[in-house]
């Protein structure tokens, strides 16, 4: 059995609480012409399980009685994010990924980040060397099949030639993608939830790099016993 580990980026590898989250807030404020509480913005994104931040911004605007087109939101959002991206920090260290590489299993990324944003971040934090396969929001041509569609997870596993994977995510959308995958595909996938901004039911939750490393080791070892 070929086993591997697949990671979300935002909220798992990289802290985007001062970049993407504020880009949503600032963009919505420009359309609504009013100030918004950042925690209310986060609540809308996470509790509604919205993976795409452009769509999360539209939902915030709609929630507060405004309107905008997706094209307008994308243009303003990208301007706001460009001003904030240097605020990002690593959550999982390079040493963490070096330790994972010592486990001799392939590592992958499945993210909703646009390709250029991902490239900028991975260049900045020097992360490319750790991953065998990277699937970003531009990898899959048809938008409806991109993350969080379970097809995207299967696509990533196929590229990595895996029979079993652990997906590490931080959102309701991540959890729902894995649950959808289990209903549609025969390959085995386990989900580990990183952080506690939102807590899906009956899943393994870890809150630190150390806890995550141990949980990943245990998941891989458990497959050896199956």
Task: Describe each model-derived feature in a short phrase.
Residues 3-9, 13-96:
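N-terminal helical cap/lid subdomain that shapes the substrate entry/recognition surface
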Residues 160-164, 216-224:
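Short, hydrophobic alpha-helical segments
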Residues 167-207:
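Acidic, Mg2+-coordinating phosphoryl-transfer loop and its flanking beta/alpha structural elements
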Residues 6, 82-109, 113-119, 150:
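Short, acidic loop-to-helix structural element flanking the phosphoryl-transfer center
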Residues 19, 95, 113-114, 148, ...:
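Short beta->alpha linker loops
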Residues 127-139, 198-218:
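Structural recognition of alpha->loop->beta junctions
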Residues 108, 114-166, 172-183:
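Substrate-recognition "cap/lid" segment bordering the active-site pocket of phosphatases
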Residues 2, 131, 188-189:
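Core-facing hydrophobic residues within beta-strands of well-ordered domains
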């Amino acid at each position: 059995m070929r086993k591997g580990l697949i990671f979300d980026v935002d909220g798992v590898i990289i802290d985007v609480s001062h970049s993407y989250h504020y880009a949503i807030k600032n963009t919505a404020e420009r359309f609504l012409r009013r100030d918004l509480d950042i925690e209310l913005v986060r609540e809308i994104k996470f509790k509604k399980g919205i993976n795409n931040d452009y769509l999360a911004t539209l939902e915030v605007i709609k929630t507060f009685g405004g309107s905008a087109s997706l094209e307008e939101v994308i243009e303003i959002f990208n301007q706001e994010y460009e001003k904030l991206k240097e605020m990002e920090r690593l959550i999982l260290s390079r040493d963490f990924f070096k330790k994972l590489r010592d486990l001799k299993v392939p590592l992958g990324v499945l993210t909703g980040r646009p390709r250029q944003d991902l490239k900028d971040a991975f260049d900045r934090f020097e992360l490319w060397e750790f991953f065998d396969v990277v699937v970003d929001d531009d990898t899959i041509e048809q938008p409806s099949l991109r993350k969080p569609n379970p097809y995207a997870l299967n696509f990533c596993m196929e590229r990595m030639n895996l029979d079993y994977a652990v997906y590490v995510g931080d959102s309701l959308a991540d959890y729902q993608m894995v649950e959808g995958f289990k209903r549609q595909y025969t390959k085995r996938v386990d989900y580990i939830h990183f952080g506690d901004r939102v807590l899906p039911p009956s899943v393994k939750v870890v809150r630190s790099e150390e806890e995550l490393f141990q949980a990943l080791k245990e998941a891989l070892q458990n497959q050896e016993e199956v």
